[in-house]
UniProtKB/Swiss-Prot annotation:
Keyword Transit peptide: no
Membrane topology of the entry: Peripheral membrane protein
The reaction(s) this protein catalyses: (S)-lactate + A = pyruvate + AH2
Chain's role: Catalyzes the conversion of L-lactate to pyruvate. Is coupled to the respiratory chain.
Gene3D superfamilies cross-referenced by the UniProt entry: Aldolase class I
Name by which UniProt lists this protein: L-lactate dehydrogenase
Annotated compartments: Cell inner membrane
Cofactor(s), by name: FMN
GO BP: any one term: aerobic respiration
Amino acid sequence: MIISSTTDFREAARRQLPRFLFDYIDGGAYAERTLARNVSDLADISLRQRVLKDVSRVSTRTTLFGVEQTLPVALAPVGLTGMYARRGEVQAARAAAAKGVPFCLSTVSVCDLAEVSRASSAPIWFQLYMLRDRGFMRDLLARAADAGATALVFTVDMPVPGARYRDAHSGMTGPNAAMRRLVQAVFKPGWAWDVGVMGRPHTLGNVAPVLGENTGLEDFMGWLGANFDPSIQWKDLDWIRDQWKGPLILKGVLDPEDAKAAADIGADGIVVSNHGGRQLDGVLSSARALPDIAEAVGDRLTVLADGGVRSGLDVVRMLALGAKGVLLGRAFVYALAARGGPGVSQLLDLIEKEMRVAMALTGVNTLDQIDRSILAKTDR
C-alpha cells in the first residue's frame, strides 16, 4: 500500500499485526476519551499563515540536554516494542540514530540495554518505573550507565496500571488469553514468522537477570505489575538522583503544580503527558495541559510533550504551545510494525518534511521563532 502519513502507517500496522498487539498499542484506558482528545485537541489548534517572508533558511535543528539533534523529537519509551517487529527496539534505535534523534528504551522492552546500545550508533535514553525492589532498580540504573545511556526518563504517572478494557477483549489479557493470541497469530503468518519465530527470545530483556531467561512473557508482566510502587512521593526522587548523575526527565506531568515541584527538586526536564490516554481517562489532553505548565515553569527546566502527535505539523503545534521537544510513541510503533526499521526512518523523514512546510508557511526559519505568536488568536 502507499504510505504518505501516520494514518497510512497505522492501517498497515493493523493489517500486519495480530489483534491483541494492535489493540495494545492503539488502545487507551476506560472509554478512551482522553486518547481521542489527545489527537483531536491538537489537530484543532489553528496556526497563522504568513506570506512574503524570507523562509529560505528553514532549519529543524535543536539542542536537548546538551546534545544537538536534527529534529526536536525523540522516540518515546514503548513497552514490548520488540513484539511489533523482529528485535524491534534494535531496529527503532538504529533508525533514530541514523536520523540524529534520541531513542528511549523502555524498562519493559524485549531487547535489553546492552543489545540496543551495541546496535545503535548513538547514545540512547532509558526509561524507568519506580518499583518496590530498590536493589533491582539500582542494578538497572547501573546497567543503563554502563550501556552509555545519556538521559533517564522516569515515569511518574504509573503508581498503578490504568484500566485498559480493550486488552481484555483483544486477548492481551482476560479469559483464555494465550489461546486467543495463538489463534490470532495463525492468521497473521508474516508476523508469526518474522517476530513469533525469528524474533525470539520473547522476554523482557531488562528484567531477565532477575527472573531468568526461560520465564514466560506473562510471568514477566505479572512480576512487573506486582512491583509497581504506589507509595512513591517527591522525596523518593532524591534516591533516584543519588543513583543517576545524568539528565533526569520526569514523564507524566499534567498539572502546573507538579511541574513546579519537578523544577524544585532539580529535574532537568519533564514530559507533559497523560501516558497516551492509557492511565486515567477524563484528564486533560496534553495539548490543553501544556500551555499552563510551560508558563508555570518558564526556563527552570526543559518542557517536552507527547500525546496525539501524528505529523510534523503536530510537532510545530506542540512547540507553539510551549514545548521544546516532542516524544513520538504510537506513530513510530505503527511505522515499525508496518515496515520495520526502514518504516521508522520513513516516518522521521516525513515528520521533518511536514515540519519544514509548516514552518515556511507560518513564516519562521528556526525553532526558537516558534511560539504562541504563530497561533491564531482563538488558540493563544
